[in-house]
Amino acid sequence: MSEDSQWLLDWPVSGGARAGRAELKTSPEDFRVTESLWPTREDDAAASGPVEVSGDGEHLCLRLEKTGDNTEYVARELAALAGCRSFDVGFCGLKDRHAVTVQWFSLYRPGQEADDQALMAEVGQRWPVRAAVRHSRKLRRGDHQANGFEIVLRNVTGQRELVEAGLERLASQGAPNYFGPQRFGFQGGNLDRAVQIDPSRLNRKRGRAGRSASKNVLYFSAARSWLFNQVLAERVSNRTWTEVLPGEPEPSGAGPTGPLWGDGGTLASGEQETLERGVVDACPGLARLFQSTRMKPERRPLVAHPGEFKWQWLDTTTLRVQFVLSPGQYATTVLGDLFELEDLSLSRDNK
């Protein structure tokens, strides 16, 4: 917790303490993200020559590689190039600006198949087009299967044996699945705004106030995420974050879960419900937001399991880490369980 913020924004780590420090995002090339939506088509496109459009449907989906541009900026530019509304451009998730990212965008272009190659050539002057697919519907958040990461950490400090042990632990056990601090705004500013919301304004059926309503949803989401992190922190502290406890809803193979608070609170029961409500009741300013909303309570896995986890020391202080995460999980959260990370992109201007 910073001196200027009332909000805890750094939560307990699985090993009790971090093993060292590291610099993150020294350059965009040190943080590579590859979105996987249609693996077979992505592999076929990578192995072939010029990009051809496959499939049928009203939406042209383009797999683009971008550096130094955030997702929403690219979506707006694509709408202008394609001559469609911004609303008609879809994507599966927001990707960092300060990175090299490969992700899919969908453009609503019914009956314009003959012009696809011309548009792709124009788009390709801005961002390399890696694959193209015609599809029956717009891409939406969370449609993708996974995100692959290749991250280079520089100026790594800490005892090598402790760092190696921590890497082994991440590979075998995973990391606490905290929401990343970017969701909460600078020094928790989104949470400060959340406690000032009139909960009735979050009811979508009572009218929409444009940008103001959109901001309220952002702040509401920040509150929900912070309460989840608080419950997860309690589970990490008592070393039960990898266990399914009595009173948790049926996990359906998801392992232990925590609450995404909603109308009625939590889906847990018994002792687990008592634990979760106790944590949330300690934050009455946020808890009241959920008393008059129609958001259903949900669950989120407590553990982020990085798949295909591997690492390589490029020199004595430079570490390359590669892994795959499910949608909604954060690479910086996984690495932050082991390292105190200094994000050098924060010192650069945002678009």
Curated annotation (Swiss-Prot):
GO molecular function annotations of the record: RNA binding; tRNA pseudouridine(13) synthase activity
Main EC class the enzyme belongs to: isomerase
Keywords (A to Z) from UniProt: Isomerase, tRNA processing
EC number, UniProt record: 5.4.99.27
Active site: D96
Catalytic activity: uridine(13) in tRNA = pseudouridine(13) in tRNA
One Gene Ontology CC term in the entry: cytosol
Gene Ontology BP terms: tRNA pseudouridine synthesis
Domain of life: Bacteria
Keyword tRNA processing in annotation: yes
Region Disordered, residue ranges: 244-268
Domain TRUD, residue spans: 174-304
UniProt family annotation: Belongs to the pseudouridine synthase TruD family.
Function of the protein: Responsible for synthesis of pseudouridine from uracil-13 in transfer RNAs.
Entry protein name: tRNA pseudouridine synthase D
Organism: Marinobacter nauticus (strain ATCC 700491 / DSM 11845 / VT8) (Marinobacter aquaeolei)
